Swiss-Prot record:
Its EC number is 7.2.2.10. SMART domains: Cation_ATPase_N. Mg(2+) binds at residues 746, 750. Gene3D superfamilies: 1.20.5.170, Calcium-transporting ATPase, cytoplasmic domain N (3.40.1110.10), Calcium-transporting ATPase, cytoplasmic transduction domain A (2.70.150.10), Calcium-transporting ATPase, transmembrane domain (1.20.1110.10), HAD superfamily/HAD-like (3.40.50.1000). This is Putative calcium-transporting ATPase 11, plasma membrane-type.
Length: 1025
């Protein structure tokens, strides 16, 4: 099978267009192309979207480079005049929405200057740049200037899915057969008897179509909900005089938005103020170089990303008037990329479908030949009646129905169903799966490279210890007793409040609230405990320049001017890095004294001591300058003020989650920017760093020769002081060694590693929009235990699909062979078209619902990972498929060829009674085998069964409908009511398959590291549900 599937391989992430086109061209037999490829990407649409995107990007380039220059020379009178409408005037505004949109879209600096810059626009939209929009005005602003929402494609109706299900070519052929059968039947047998066969087929087709459409419609609603969740972005704005967080969809014209590294620009707008703002416009214009935005070039476009710096912007245009909104409106949905499992199972379906087509043709040919031979023997070869035509039509319907049963198109669709179910459950468990393949791939992961802060720890940081003036002070509940001189205290408060990117605001109840990163919040809270006041500090100093924190420099700097005209630079960051920038230290009198080698060594010991207690350490430093530097702020000559130790407690349950991963064969590696002592202390507390494990610094790792790096990689459990490039190198090399790597990230610089990994996991709280966009899964609560839950559900998806494949292939084999052999030997098929359609629904839609939606049990995380190279259909599965198929073929074969004698069936209705028994026994074999398929290797198949209400409901419905078909729908399904003895016999024949399953599972099959994920029998421990 593996050799046959060589054309059905795609990369687990970002598959090439050529690979997708190759495997689709390999799918030679497709019953319903629209349905089979509906839940995955539409290659034509993707190509069309790319073409449109390029055209729009080219137009935007023209705007940037031609129109921008042209406006320098165009007379203002030639520009379009925008007349102010009464509605706008009545609302208290003095500028039209289209005028604002045109100004920003065309980068019309002349019009902006004429209006009066950001301040002038603020006046025209009746907003204060300091206070922001008033909440009471939101409704009127949305009414006049629009909402910040893009036009959504209308949801497809249920009838669309019904129509799609009807596109199945084999069902269409059967409908034609049914209509002809009704016509011929009524002509020969009269009304209503002549309608039964054809009407039975039509009713079966309607049932199949409705169940299929309902299943697909529910899936589409789930994906639509998930898509809406993906588009939720929280941004920071100033409203009612305070900084607050709002949804991107609640943004209005006039809002003052705060932007920082990694943010998405949420609407079109104008730069108000900021520092070193660089914007990545590649998603909009295609330009790879970042654009520098400042007061001279103040225009910001929706959909672009903040690559560096920070700023405040005034929103001028929202929703469909923005350039991004127009782009989104132009592009149609292209759908999801295929998951590797979908591709592989499409291959399996195609190969089996071709085999089934061969069997169907052979069955039809054999039945026709036997019929012709019988007529020739009877001497009536030249005499043909409408009854003969009806017989041939029945033969053709049986052949077509064999194709319906033979092509297991439910295989790839079961993957979608299972993934959709898992994605919905994970959503309630605080994990948003952005790409289908991620959930599937996560089940195969062999290692997780995780951040520390916020993922392993709570991200609720507090300053726990501080070193200042050669003394270590520890936090006593909510207070610090530092006993500092006024001069030292003032310098420390300055170093805290001047060098921050966060805000201290009052909430509606008047309580102090700190908005910003957890580290910033901890330091500002420390400053407030010292009695500092943010507003006072901001009034006394003017910020001249900011160099924001990033993962490479591991420090943040700010340049300020005092009221007296002095220029002072403040810096804070990783202790061992910032300490090297210091030449002096503040003494107890607030004076700067030289920093000797001995003192540096002493301070380094303090830092090491803090770190060994799992405290994050930061140095706060400053330096006075004669004048403001033109370029970057200095990297030396600073005076050390204090070393703070920040406590970030380990999350409850993380140690247990790490142990779960280790039991599951998943290696957990911690990759952090903290120093190695802090990293090791946290890693030991979490259970990550074990005996024999290696903790290494990023600088040492990146300088290793290739052969040494390969040798040490399997042992690395902690990487400290790492750069984003180190994380990318680690992930890349682990993948080269055959590992399936999941990696977490929250910063903009983590994007390459998230993109490189098999599964990128972005943090929902601490993560930037750039990180989220490059991730496959967003961990909404930033919790490591949630990551483990994603892995558990990924394994459940993989194993559930294995169960379904085992079940469906068994039905395929038996249905094909029993009808073919019977046709060859007896000249008739025991299973009619209506019966085969019912069997098809049992094994396709209902089987997928029952087996592909089983929730995970704890035992899944006690098994080795599947890995990258495992065969999907394992030896254990083949053993079960072959064993069950042989049993069913033997039993049904005996009934078919000797059933009348064994059961002592006589009389004119003996044949239909026997065929009903065969059909009923066949269905009950599948019912019991579906229960068997809940476990591939474990004997106890009932464990946790009643916790899966979907499975129980499907089993109950299947048995209930089978009783109705046999007892009450005989005219349509070619069955007759059975005696209780015959019912007992059918159930007994089906139940024997469960005893057989126990025996089969005791037959050892060769195992390897990457088996199907189940404990080997009989020694495997029992799972707890």
């Amino acid at each position: 099978m593996s050799n046959l599937l060589k054309d059905f391989e795609v990369a687990s992430k970002n598959p090439s267009l050529e690979a997708r086109q190759r495997w689709r061209s390999s799918v030679g037999l497709v019953k319903n192309r629209a349905r089979r490829f509906r839940m995955i990407s539409n290659l034509d649409k993707l190509a069309e979207n790319e073409k449109k995107r390029c055209q729009i990007q080219e137009k935007i380039r023209v705007v940037f480079y031609v129109q921008k220059a042209a406006f320098q020379f165009i007379d203002a009178g030639a520009r379009p005049e925008y007349k102010l409408t009464d509605e706008v005037k009545k609302a208290g505004f003095y500028v039209e929405a289209d005028e604002l949109a045109s100004m920003v879209r065309n980068h019309d600096t002349k019009s902006l200057t004429k209006i009066g810059g950001p301040e002038g626009i603020a006046q025209k939209v009746s907003v204060s740049l300091a206070e922001g929009v008033r909440s009471s005005e939101l409704h009127i602003r949305e009414k006049i200037y629009g909402e910040n929402r893009y036009t959504e494609k209308p949801a497809r109706s249920f009838l669309t899915f019904v129509w799609e299900a009807l596109q199945d070519i084999t069902l269409i052929i059967l409908m034609v057969c049914a209509v002809v059968s009704i016509g011929v039947g009524v002509a020969t047998e009269g009304f209503p008897k002549g309608m039964y066969d054809g009407t039975g087929i039509l009713l079966s087709i309607i049932l199949v179509v409705m169940v299929t459409a309902i299943s697909d419609y529910k899936q589409s609603l789930q994906f639509r909900d998930l898509d809406r969740e993906k588009k939720k972005i929280i941004i920071q704005v100033t409203r009612d005089g305070s900084r607050q967080e709002v949804s991107i969809h609640d943004l209005v014209v006039g809002d003052v938005v705060h932007l920082s590294i990694g943010d998405q620009v949420p609407a079109d707008g104008i730069f108000i103020s900021g520092y070193n703002l660089e914007i990545d416009e590649s998603s909009l214009s295609g330009e790879s170089e970042p654009s520098h935005v400042n007061k001279e070039k103040p225009f910001l476009l929706s959909g672009t990303k903040v690559q560096n710096g920070s700023a405040k912007m005034l929103v001028t245009t929202v929703g469909m008037r923005t350039e991004w909104g127009k782009l989104m409106d132009t592009l149609s949905e292209g759908g999801e990329d295929e998951t590797p499992l979908q591709v592989k199972l499409n291959g399996v379906a195609t190969i089996i479908g071709k085999i089934g087509l061969g069997f169907a043709v052979l069955t039809f040919v054999v039945l026709c030949i036997r019929f012709v031979v019988e007529k020739a023997t009877a001497g009536s070869i030249t005499e043909w009646s409408s009854e003969d035509a009806l017989t041939l039509l029945d033969y053709f319907a049986i052949a077509v129905t064999i194709i319906v049963v033979a092509v297991p198109e439910g295989l790839p669709l079961a993957v979608t169903l299972s993934l959709a179910f898992a994605m919905k459950q994970l959503m309630s468990d605080r994990a948003l799966v952005r790409h289908l393949a991620a959930c599937e791939t996560m089940g195969s992961s062999t290692c997780i490279c995780t951040d520390k802060t916020g993922t392993l720890t709570t991200n609720h940081m507090v300053v726990n210890k501080v070193w200042i003036c050669e003394n270590i002070k520890e936090r006593q509940e909510e207070n610090f007793q530092l006993n500092l001189s006024e001069q030292v205290k003032n310098i420390l408060i300055q170093a805290i409040f001047q060098n921050t990117g966060s805000e201290v605001v009052k909430d509606k109840e008047g309580k102090t609230q700190i908005l910003g990163s957890p580290t910033e919040r901890a330091i500002l809270e420390f400053g407030l405990l010292l009695g500092g006041d943010v507003d006072t500090q901001r009034r006394e100093h003017k910020i001249l320049k900011i160099e924001p924190f990033n993962s490479d420099k591991k420090k943040m700097s700010v340049l300020t001017s005092h009221s007296g005209g002095k220029v002072r630079a403040f810096c804070k960051g990783a202790s061992e890095i910032v300490l090297k920038m210091c030449e002096k230290v503040v003494d107890s009198n607030g004076e700067s004294v030289p920093l000797s080698e001995e003192k540096i060594a002493s301070i380094s010991d303090v830092i090491e001591g803090f770190a060994s207690e799992a405290l994050r350490t930061l140095c706060l430093v400053y330096t006075d300058l004669d004048e403001a530097p033109r370029g970057d702020l200095p990297n030396g000559g600073y005076t050390l003020v204090a070393v703070v130790g920040i406590k970030d407690p380990v999350r409850p349950g993380v140690r247990e989650a790490v142990q779960t991963c280790q039991a599951a064969g998943i290696t957990v590696r911690m990759v952090t920017g903290d120093n190695i002592s802090t990293a090791k202390a946290i890693a030991k507390e979490c259970g990550i760093l074990t005996a024999g494990g290696v903790a290494i610094e990023g600088s040492d790792f990146r300088n290793l020769p290739p052969h040494e790096m390969r040798a040490i990689l399997p042992k690395i459990q902690v990487m400290a002081r790492s750069l984003p490039l180190d994380k990318h190198t680690l992930v890349n090399n682990l993948r080269k060694m055959g590992e399936v790597v999941a990696v977490t990230g929250d910063g903009t610089n983590d994007a390459p590693a998230l993109h490189e990994a098999d599964i990128g996991l972005a943090m929902g709280i601490a993560g930037t929009e750039v990180a989220k966009e490059n991730a496959d899964v967003i961990i909404m609560d930033d919790n490591f235990a949630t990551i483990v839950n994603v892995a558990k559900w990924g394994r459940a998806v993989y194993i559930n699909i294995q169960k379904f494949v085992q079940f469906q292939l068994t039905v395929n084999v038996v249905a094909l062979i029993i009808n073919f052999v019977s046709a060859c030997i007896t000249g008739s098929a025991p299973l009619t078209a209506v019966q085969l359609l019912w069997v098809n629904m049992i094994m396709d839609t209902l089987g997928a619902l029952a087996l592909a939606t089983e929730p995970p049990n704890e035992g899944l995380m006690k098994r080795q990972p599947i890995g990258r190279t495992a065969s999907f259909i394992t030896r254990a599965m083949w053993r079960n498929i072959i064993g069950q198929s042989i049993y069913q073929l033997i039993v049904l074969g005996i009934l078919n060829f000797a059933g009348k004698q064994i059961l002592n069936l006589n009389g004119p209705d003996s044949t239909i009674v026997l065929n009903t028994i065969i059909f009923n026994s066949f269905v009950f074999c599948q019912v019991f085998n579906e229960v068997n398929s809940r476990e591939i290797e474990k004997i106890n198949v009932f464990e946790g069964m009643f916790k899966s209400w979907v499975f129980v409901a499907v089993m109950t419905a299947t048995v209930g409908f089978q009783v109705i078909i046999v007892e009450f729908l005989g005219a349509f399904a070619s069955t007759v009511p059975l005696s209780w003895q015959h019912w007992l016999l059918c159930i007994l024949i089906g139940s024997v398959s469960m005893i057989l399953a126990v025996g089969l599972k005791c037959i050892p099959v060769e195992s390897n590291r990457h088996h199907d994920g189940y404990e080997l029998l009989p020694s495997g421990p029992s799972d707890s549900a």
